[in-house]
Amino acid sequence: MKVGITASKSDDFSEWYTQVVLKAELADYAPVKGLIVLRPDGYSIWESIRTSLDVKLAARGVRNGFLPVLIPESLLGKEKEHFAGFNPEVFWVTHSGENKVGDRLALRPTSETLAYSLYSKWIKSWRDLPLRINFWNTALRAEIKSTKPFLRTSEFLWQEGHTVHACSEEAESEVAAILELYRETVEGDLAIPVITGRKSEKEKFVGAVYTTTMESMMPDGRALQMGTSHFLGQNFSRPFEVKFADKDNVEHFAWQTSWGLSWRLIGAMIMVHGDDKGLVLPPKVAPLQVVIIPISYSGEEGAQVLAAAEGMEAELLKAGIRARTDKREELTPGFKFHDWEMRGVPVRIEIGPRDLKDGSAVLATRHDGKKSKVPLDGAAVNIEEELCRVQTEMLGAAKRALDGMIHDASSYGALTKAVEGGGFVRAAWCGGLECEEKVKEETGADIRVVPEGGAEGACIVCGGRAASIPLFARGY
């Protein structure tokens, strides 16, 4: 395998993506088809997402729990519509050693049925509400389509939150608040802009009253769902008997929400920000934010350069900046430059003998390739400012790219043509399933998101009165 990225992002997007994942050492393929192994840098990015989200969730009173991976078939079938939606994707455990299990066990595709069977035991009174629990775990869903690391795998890391409320209004407020919290995380940490709104009835989560979603557009013109938040109403509390007694001791079925996002965000980050050299990482989630490269290694001069590099590393680490000095003497500085560029490290510091004399170092930023001078003394303040600039500029560039991939269509012909070109297509829709399915069948585009707001004019499919102006797109 050649060291660098050999595929072009614009010419062979799929091969480029795979090379970046493998060569930047984010993940590797497992021996079982459809599964991947997460390597330390890939897991570090996931940990950053998790830490950021945990802080926000804790501020809302959400606590973390753990659920087992095995779910009895009898439990899955309690909410039949929900189960039917996942049945084709379920992995089943039928034996324990040589013995056949009585009730087949599903490897968790999602945890609603398991969690709510327990919630019905835990909740008795209005004093037990609201109940807000989040679970960081894996989900397993057999992928029958072609698989791709982080985007389509049969096992994936995610978080799923499940809350219970005394009234519909509080539950719906929770749904909206979680989606906003997701948006803040994705835009603020991953520098990926999203469009929020609702899913259509056809595309909503199975068993939900409605689903809210955040969607983004990838550079290849295909949409990616970044996270969802569902209002479940009483669709699960009734079959699972999640009930509470109010202050007058009158019993009611509870109102529920569920919500989740997965490591698919890492795939989106790779696609949105990466270039032909490899990864481009937003500083907030980069496992390594600054790499320091000494230019000289030999003699007293080399020792002085290395000492300066290590001194800067210590200063940056003390300031809370993730930094490392590349001390690999067998590799040339040029090779190191390319290697760290491929791995997406946001800032590179170069220190050579001449820099020591000047009392400065060369700072290069990965996202734009710009170089500048930074003083050796007190470098942490300057580098912190650069990291903030990088984070802001990456989000700005991604927003401009997203804006350029949203198109308007005022006729069905314009819609079909725009879908072929890739990106989101904004068009009036009557809200009818028949019109939605016609677009899907003839263009391959789904309704990805229905933003808030009314609509004027006529449905571009049937000519009926428009109910909304959704964004259509082909997706992952």
From Swiss-Prot:
Its EC number is 6.1.1.15. Keywords: Aminoacyl-tRNA synthetase, ATP-binding, Cytoplasm, Ligase, Nucleotide-binding, Protein biosynthesis. CDD domains: ProRS_anticodon_zinc, ProRS_core_arch_euk. It is found in: Cytoplasm. Consists of three domains: the N-terminal catalytic domain, the anticodon-binding domain and the C-terminal extension. PANTHER family: BIFUNCTIONAL GLUTAMATE_PROLINE--TRNA LIGASE (PTHR43382:SF2), PROLYL-TRNA SYNTHETASE (PTHR43382). Belongs to the class-II aminoacyl-tRNA synthetase family. ProS type 3 subfamily. This is Proline--tRNA ligase. It comes from Cenarchaeum symbiosum (strain A). The gene is proS.
